Amino acid sequence: MAKKKSEDHSGADANDSDYNEEPNFDDPPNFVDNISDEDLLGDMLAQRPSEADGVESVVVVDNMPKVEPSRLDKLKSVINKLFSHCGEIVNVVYPVDEEGNTKGYAFMEYKTASQAEDAVKKLNNHRLDKNYTFAVNLFTDFQKYENIPEKWEPPTVQPFKVQSDLYNFINDPDTYDQYCVAAETAPNCVQVGFWQNTLPEPNELETRERFTDTFVKWSPLGTYVVTFHKPGVAIWGGSSFQKIQKFPHPGTQFVEFSPCENYLVTYGPTPTGQKIIIWDIRTGGEKRSFVGDGMSVLSMFRWSHDDKYVARMGESSIHIYETPSFYLLDLKSIKIPGIRGFSWSPTDNVIAYWVEEQNQIPARVTLMKIPKKREIRNKNLFHVADCKLHWQKSGDYLCVKVDRYSKLKKDKKELDVKFLGMFYNFEIFHMREKEIPVDSIEIRELILAFAWEPIGNKFSIIHGEQNSANVSFYEVNKGVKPSLVKRLEKKSCTHLFWSPRGQFIVMANLTMGTFEFVDTTNDYIISASPDHFRASEVEWDPTGRYVVTGVSSWKVKEDTGFNMYTLQGRIIKRTILKNFVQFLWRPRPPTLLSEEKQKEIKKNLKKYYPTFEQKDRLRLTRASKELLEKRAQLRETFMEYRNKRIAEWKDQKSRRQMLRGHVDTDNLETDEVDEEVVEFLVKEEITLLE
């Protein structure tokens, strides 16, 4: 509220009075307001109270079975059980004919209108069985459709919007990769810059101020980038990163794309848990929504590799939904008592899940083929505390890390369970071999990390004490037990990052910011050991040629930025960026070349070397020429600025002499200066001697 000008400040200048006087909000004379209330206050008018007629909480359920009086009680039981999940049902009416048979629809009244809306959203188009699919509508919808005008008016033709090419980023003749860099410029305001990793210096493609509130995320194939905002999320794409689609879901904290980029899942909080919405990316429409209990494993959806199925884990069950209808597979969940975790194969419609020990029944790892729900492999496990499922990227192997115990200690109420004498097993499933054989490796030390080679048959583990751990590399071959091929001892690392193309690996300590680059085909020699103090992330580019380490402001506030290295660990670029948040390489879609064509190119790769080397020389020559021209331009600009300032300095000579007693201090020699020494008392101290 503006403060009135007081008498004590009557002598203030005009600038101060501008701030103290109350502003005038009156419209100027002859002002015409051409903005409607709907345009100006649309969000508020949508919430204004309206006259109610008492039927807002009533829904109409159509396409129900028509049953005789003897079967009516059973139908009521089924319907009540299904619809009571949406809220408290106050009254239900089943209209009947003269013989007492139901007419195939019912009126259902909920306690509140919001519960009725929730029932329509969740149960409309719900399949009761193969013959009956519910049509659920609000009773007020009938009144709305009664007011449809009799004269039909054709819809207004919308102008065609030319959409940018979403795949232009893979048309670059030199196949340079792209990346984005995010930095926070103000609270809830993040600037995002998009770059192309050209040589010798990266090329800036686009920079967006206030592009997102928190962070960004690429889609799996690199087609879209998603941004987070208070009303929801938006996806962007094309050559200039224009908005493609927006999805209204207030407070969205996390999103997940389906592998083929057909669907988007948004996770947002609610007062009682979490709301999860699955969207169609191309249309922007909502396919289905769920209510979860928070960011727990029971809330997370997992997609099959081909987008045909999406699954989530429930209490003693797995719910698998088919796309695009998002109905349950075979209209029912898969009952699996004691299930603790599951994961899809990255290349096949196979689900791996594990079940905990129950009543002297051993734990079990199972592979199930979808959609037939046929179990193709089982493995029983004893004394199991926990399991982790690790698929190799190519889908050739599945490793189950089993945390086992020697002794189990429970308190009297069996609420607190302690596992003693822990040791670990790796169960390796050979997915491409007949009957899926399983190999087992036992490790008696603490396992700190596990990582598969994405393309290849090796995996690596960190085991032992954290400050002096060992890194072991195992090789998996057909018909032979996995063998230890190399052990690097006394390594201070916490994470393992394989190159997307295999062969090279970075052993990282994300606590201390130390890194070691290893070539697994060259006797596991450490090619470089750079440091990046406080680094909290490591990102390989899609081709496996470059590695980026970053210090994010989410972790620290000083010395934030990122470093770029070659795959051998040679530093290429150091960038210090205030409030740096994220560095993300843009993913690439899989190649369209057949395996035969790829093998042919690899076989004849040497004949392409001269062409590549010539292009590199021309590029460096061009870059050197551009660099020399840039330096010459900078020197010319500097000399022009210098000459201008010298001319100003000479023009001010008479003024300087006048201010300095008509002494030309510009040409004053050292021997013309009179030096005078002045002494004065600073302080006086008196010390008494005994």
From Swiss-Prot:
Statement: the UniProt record of this protein carries the keyword RNA-binding: yes
Per-repeat ranges for WD: 207-246, 292-331, 334-369, 442-484, 530-575
Coiled coil feature spans: 613-646
Molecular function via GO: RNA binding; translation initiation factor activity; translation initiation factor binding
Any Pfam family hit: RRM_1
Alphabetical list of PROSITE patterns matching this protein: RRM
Biased composition (Acidic residues): 15-25
Location of region: Disordered: 1-33
Disulfide-bond pairs as recorded: none
GO CC term, one of those recorded: eukaryotic 48S preinitiation complex
Localization per record: Cytoplasm
GO biological process: follicle cell of egg chamber development; formation of cytoplasmic translation initiation complex; regulation of translational initiation
Predominant place of localization: cytoplasm
InterPro entries: EIF3B, eIF3B_RRM, Nucleotide-bd_a/b_plait_sf, RBD_domain_sf, RRM_dom, TIF_beta_prop-like, WD40/YVTN_repeat-like_dom_sf
Alphabetical UniProt keywords: Coiled coil, Cytoplasm, Initiation factor, Protein biosynthesis, Repeat, RNA-binding, WD repeat
Stretches with biased composition (Basic and acidic residues): 1-11
Quaternary structure (record): Component of the eukaryotic translation initiation factor 3 (eIF-3) complex. The eIF-3 complex interacts with pix. Interacts with mxt.
Family: Belongs to the eIF-3 subunit B family.
Function: RNA-binding component of the eukaryotic translation initiation factor 3 (eIF-3) complex, which is involved in protein synthesis of a specialized repertoire of mRNAs and, together with other initiation factors, stimulates binding of mRNA and methionyl-tRNAi to the 40S ribosome. The eIF-3 complex specifically targets and initiates translation of a subset of mRNAs involved in cell proliferation.
PANTHER family to which the protein is assigned, alphabetical: EUKARYOTIC TRANSLATION INITIATION FACTOR 3 EIF3 -RELATED, EUKARYOTIC TRANSLATION INITIATION FACTOR 3 SUBUNIT B
Name of the protein described by the UniProt record: Eukaryotic translation initiation factor 3 subunit B
Gene of this entry: eIF3b
